[in-house]
Regions:
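TPR-repeat structural position
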Residues: 20-21, 77, 84
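Residues that mark the junctions of alpha-helical repeat units in TPR/alpha-solenoid scaffolds
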Residues: 3, 53-56, 60, 80, ...
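Short, charge-rich amphipathic alpha-helical segments embedded
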Residues: 27-55, 89-99
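TPR repeat positional signature
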Residues: 7, 57, 64, 111-114, ...
């Protein structure tokens, strides 16, 4: 098991035990590890694009979602919304840099993965209708139109 996967597993165990702060620490460590892997993806001999889009991007997205969940469980709503906004922008920038020169199947896969963050933002926005500052962050995600959308359509 890779270091980031171990942290996700330990974070999940902590979350299941209602130890949300501890879960957040594990999720953050796993996310940081994934973000450090990105430099290998941008090197002279990167892994295959299919692995990047079908393995790395979903892991990155799930890591942000796990961290957001742990922040919400601690009632740190602003922090969760900020993380979701950062996560969406990070995943979007990352995906866009790879899929512009990819085939339709990889573009579609990347868009499907990114839609998970948008879906999460929609669900969270419904719950936070009375928190305008949080809604602003979520609306940034909800209203983003990506280059990937334009390439596919």
């Amino acid at each position: 098991m890779q270091y980031w996967q171990l942290n996700v597993s330990e974070g999940n165990a902590a979350f299941a035990s209602n130890q949300f702060a501890r879960a957040a620490l594990h999720y953050r460590a796993g996310l940081d590890e994934l973000l450090s892997i990105e430099r290998f993806i941008h090197c002279d001999s990167p892994p295959p694009k299919a692995w990047i889009i079908d393995q790395y991007l979903p892991a990155l997205i799930v890591s942000y979602l796990n961290l957001c969940d742990s922040k919400l469980a601690q009632n740190k709503i602003e922090s969760a919304c900020e993380l979701l906004e950062i996560g969406y922008q990070t995943a979007l920038n990352f995906a866009t840099s790879f899929v512009q020169k990819s085939d339709f199947q990889l573009q579609n896969s990347a868009l499907r993965h990114l839609s998970q963050l948008k879906k999460y933002a929609f669900l969270l926005a419904k719950q936070l209708a009375n928190k305008p500052s949080s809604l602003l962050k979520l609306n940034t995600i909800i209203n983003t139109h990506t280059i990937i959308n334009h390439n596919i359509h």
